[in-house]
Amino acid sequence: MSSQSYYMNDLDDLRSLESSTLNKKDTAINELNPEQNDTRRSTDLLLEDKYGIQTGFSKYWKKCTYGIREYCKFIGPGFLIAVAYIDPGNYSTDLDAGSRFQYKLLFIVFLSNLFAVYLQSLCIRLGSVTGMDLARNCREHYNRYICWSFYVLAEIAIIATDIAEVIGTAVALKILMHIPLVAGVVITILDVLLVLIAWRPEGSMLSVRIFETAVALLVLVVAISFAVVLGRVHIGGAGTVFKGFLPSSTVFSREGLYSSIGILGATVMPHSLFLGSGLVQTRLRDLDVRRGNYTPVGDCSDYRPTHETIKHSLTYSIVEVALSLFTFALFTNSSILIVAGAVFYNTSGADTSDLFSIYDLLKEYVSISCGRLFAVALLFSGMSAGYVCTIAGQIVSEGYINWNLRPWLRRVITRAIAIIPCLVVSAAVGQSGLNQVLNASQVCLSILLPFLTFPLVMFTCSRKVMRVVSDSTNEETGQLIRETHDYSLGWTMTIVTWAIWLFLTALNLLLIVWLGMGVSF
């Protein structure tokens, strides 16, 4: 056979294949729509299902469904992290801001949520790339004196956070079950048993998902409760509320700035940084195990995510946390402030507003059920926040000083320290003093925030820390190829990150100066 004849036969085969493909497509369209023109979407789906012909829409549809399925596998940590932003401390600061300035500090609530989402994205990036949480990274890269200093600050933040959970839960128990405050404070230590039974970070994914689902249900109850309360409270025009999300001169007044710093401290919680960087490893490890890249040994402390797993998981993890914070956390915090602004603003009780008084006013001016819904939301917030505070405390102690204390014992110690000031205040001055302790704990958290975020900023901007080495084999030569992948922040994001950190630091320095001068708020 001549060369020319050979190529002619190949050309005929190609033409025949093309004609056959087009005939299949035409036949499919005719079968689908014998009498009238159908939509392109239906045609494309039929071609894909019946003949296996890939079309533009079918490829796009497959890509979307695949992305949604993969995203659903990462749902869970966002709910645990969101709990840190809707704890009883937020009730106190948002209640104070709403009663004094109505809706004008909603801008700070929104800004705080933006900061929280951005800092959480850094935490997830750090935890995913290094395979270690923020505390463990500090132990790996700092000397023990610096590490112990950060550990002490982190423990103070955990205790200050726990104080808010204790007070919120005790107040809710008194409202709902008429349990005395002192007894309610003592009862809060019982949640240690629930955490001991439920939380198994080194266990199977099923046990982790069960715990995440339980906390997610608590978060949903809080959100639904406030949705109902918002529907029953007269908040004025929607324009007035939405105007509060715009910057206002009130933010820069002395009283407004103090409330703003309190909101920042209550929203951008320091212990949430350890949660965000520590919760991602479970899913990364599970994915590497299923792909055959890692075999669990002991407590899995030697685990480091592969580049393939990091590349696949990083975006899903960040999006999952961002959606959780922008939906549940932002909605709940805004709702608390809006309800307080609608009920307390320009009233005689604005200066004495606390968790008890907002319950009384809701019960008197709206309905008894509305007041009880508020108390239910407060109770579930305190419970769920107490659970995740236990997890954060465990990450802190194990990461900074390698203190492998049993979770229940560590929880007993932390909660025992936290309930001491609450017991003293509740026994001495009753409910009037608890609100002051609650507000002070949130300001304390705000002061600690710049110190605990500094290592996070340093690590995520460092090429040395944020690099991953991957090995592959050249198929032709069989040689080992080693590649280094840089996940550190670029110049633009580095500037943004340091700008946020400097902003938070400047606010807290101003607060410290005012407190040192004895300025009253």
Curated annotation (Swiss-Prot):
Protein name: Manganese transporter pdt1
HAMAP family recorded: NRAMP (MF_00221)
Role summary: Transports manganese ions into the cell. Regulates cell morphogenesis through control of manganese homeostasis.
Gene name tied to this protein: pdt1
Subcellular localization: Endoplasmic reticulum membrane
UniProt cross-references to PANTHER family, sorted A to Z: MANGANESE TRANSPORTER SMF1, SOLUTE CARRIER PROTEIN FAMILY 11 MEMBER
Residues with PTM Phosphoserine: S42
GO molecular function annotation: cadmium ion transmembrane transporter activity; manganese ion transmembrane transporter activity; metal ion binding
Residues passing through the membrane, by range: 71-91, 104-124, 152-172, 179-199, 210-230, 233-253, 260-280, 325-345, 373-393, 417-437, 440-460, 495-515
Database matches in Pfam families: Nramp (PF01566)
The UniProt record lists the keyword Transmembrane: yes
UniProt similarity note: Belongs to the NRAMP family.
Any one Gene Ontology BP term: manganese ion transport
Keywords: Endoplasmic reticulum, Manganese, Membrane, Metal-binding, Phosphoprotein, Transmembrane, Transmembrane helix, Transport
Entry's Gene Ontology cellular component terms: endoplasmic reticulum membrane; plasma membrane
Membrane-topology descriptor: Multi-pass membrane protein
Coiled coil: none
Chief site of localization: endoplasmic reticulum
PTM annotation (Phosphothreonine): residues: T43
